[in-house]
Curated annotation (Swiss-Prot):
Gene: tyrS
Protein name, per record: Tyrosine--tRNA ligase
Keyword terms of this UniProt record: Aminoacyl-tRNA synthetase, ATP-binding, Cytoplasm, Ligase, Nucleotide-binding, Protein biosynthesis, RNA-binding
SMART domains, A to Z: S4
Position of sequence motif 'KMSKS' region: 226-230
Species whose genome carries this gene: Borrelia turicatae (strain 91E135)
Binding site for L-tyrosine: 35, 166, 170
HAMAP family, A to Z: Tyr_tRNA_synth_type1
Compartments where found: Cytoplasm
Gene Ontology CC: one annotated term: cytosol
Annotated residues for binding of ATP: 229
């Protein structure tokens, strides 16, 4: 097998390929142009998006040429893959804003001085519908499309015609990239298999060229929690939506059983180093978790931000010298105290919990601390005297910490 593909297989990235043997032969012969697509449904990518772009980085390191395709055009329709209901249709202005934001994030992760970031609105926005149906639509079998899992799942509950067109447009993207950039490989999540195979078939029918599709496994956590979700919601790559500190802590606190797998998926560390680092158990595995958190934070936010997050975590949880300024904080208005404020109300106000009932449950279970002192009273109140030097430290369980500042 080609070295680049061996690396992907070793690190757990390979799920399905349209023709792995032929792709391996091609990659031995030439620098292959490949692409990963992402729709502009949000102002930020989340960590679920990182997997295909980590693959992109690995392939680029082996000399192959990446294209990141931001779906300024396809976002106007919405991909039904993996969805139980139709996506919300975004305004043109929102899509343009999202495309710009996602482009900026990708530039931090991938070196596009030897690659491309493109927007499929460049060719989709001006399509003539009749010509598209005659030229492209004729190549698709409705019966075959309905056989793909994406449409099987949705057809029972209702699939709009606009969503049904999505597969044609994604296939057309691959067709256009093959024509203008000689792109021969599309990479995506395994839920994209039907769309990717359809693009491979379209190019074969229209151009007589063999191209390839490769899908990646859905990443799950050993504790059953959905990858990319936390108590605070989606783990975004935008520091304004999900702080660098919280991003670091998310990976620092992954279950022990996931450490080795995540080191392979989310870092560029060598095999020997990963195997050695993850061979220990118990508290000794904390070093590997810290390395995982630092490496992925460095990739997404840069080395300076990763160092600050690491320093803040040590200051918060180990009592070591570190920069507490990088620990998340909540600014409490003085007039909110009005003499005093219930701890339960402060927890809801600062959004460390979503409800008063959750706050009561945590206090009753002994999981709430003020300045390292456990609080067991649901009616506990704070006043200005609690805020030594203008702040307190609110800790929830072992892993969540917040500075509350006046």
């Amino acid at each position: 097998m080609n070295l680049a593909l061996e690396i992907l297989e070793k690190r757990g990235f390979l799920k399905q390929c349209t023709n792995l043997e032929a792709l391996s032969t091609l990659m031995d012969k030439e620098r292959v142009v490949f692409y990963v697509g992402v729709d502009a449904t949000s102002t930020s990518l989340h960590i679920g998006h990182l997997i295909p772009f980590m693959v992109m980085a690995h392939l680029q390191r082996q000399g192959h040429i990446p294209i990141a395709l931001v779906g300024g055009g396809t976002t106007k329709i919405g991909d039904p893959s993996g969805k139980d209901a139709m996506r919300k249709i975004l305004s043109k202005e929102d899509i343009e804003k999202n495309v710009k934001a996602i482009r900026a994030q990708l530039l931090r992760i991938i070196d596009f001085s030897h690659g491309y970031i493109l927007d499929n609105s460049a060719w989709l926005d001006n399509i003539n519908y009749i010509e598209f149906l005659r030229d492209i639509g004729v190549c698709f079998s409705v019966n075959r499309m309905l056989g793909f899992e994406t449409y099987k799942r949705r057809i029972k509950d209702g699939l709009s015609f606009i969503e049904f067109n999505y597969q044609l447009l994604q296939s057309y993207d691959f067709y256009m990239l093959n024509k203008i950039k000689n792109c021969k490989l599309q990479i995506g999540g395994d839920d994209q298999w039907g769309n990717i195979v359809s693009g491979v078939d379209l190019i074969k029918k229209k151009l007589g060229t063999e191209v390839f599709g490769l899908t990646l496994p859905l990443i799950t956590r050993s504790d059953g929690k959905k990858m990319g979700k936390s108590e605070k919601g989606a783990v975004y790559l935008d520091a304004e939506l999900y702080s660098v500190y919280d991003f670091y802590q998310y990976f620092r606190n992954v279950p022990d059983l996931d450490v080795k797998n995540f080191l392979y998926l989310f870092t560029f560390l060598g095999d020997d180093e990963i195997e050695h680092m993850s061979s220990v158990k118990g508290y000794l595995l904390n070093k590997a978790k810290e390395t995982l958190a630092f490496e992925i934070t460095k990739i997404v936010h840069g080395e300076d931000a990763a160092l600050k997050a690491s320093s803040a975590a040590r200051a918060a949880f180990k009592g070591s010298e570190g920069d507490r300024a990088d620990i998340p904080f909540f600014k409490l208005a003085l007039d909110s105290l009005e003499g005093s404020i219930l701890l339960i109300d402060l927890m809801v106000l600062s959004k460390v919990v979503s409800s008063k009932s959750e706050a009561r449950r945590l206090i009753n279970s002994g999981g709430v601390y003020i300045d390292k002192v456990r609080i067991g009273d649901q009616d506990y109140c704070l006043n200005k005297d609690n805020f030594i030097n203008g702040e307190i430290e609110l800790k929830i369980g072992k892993k969540r910490i917040l500075r509350v500042i006046l």
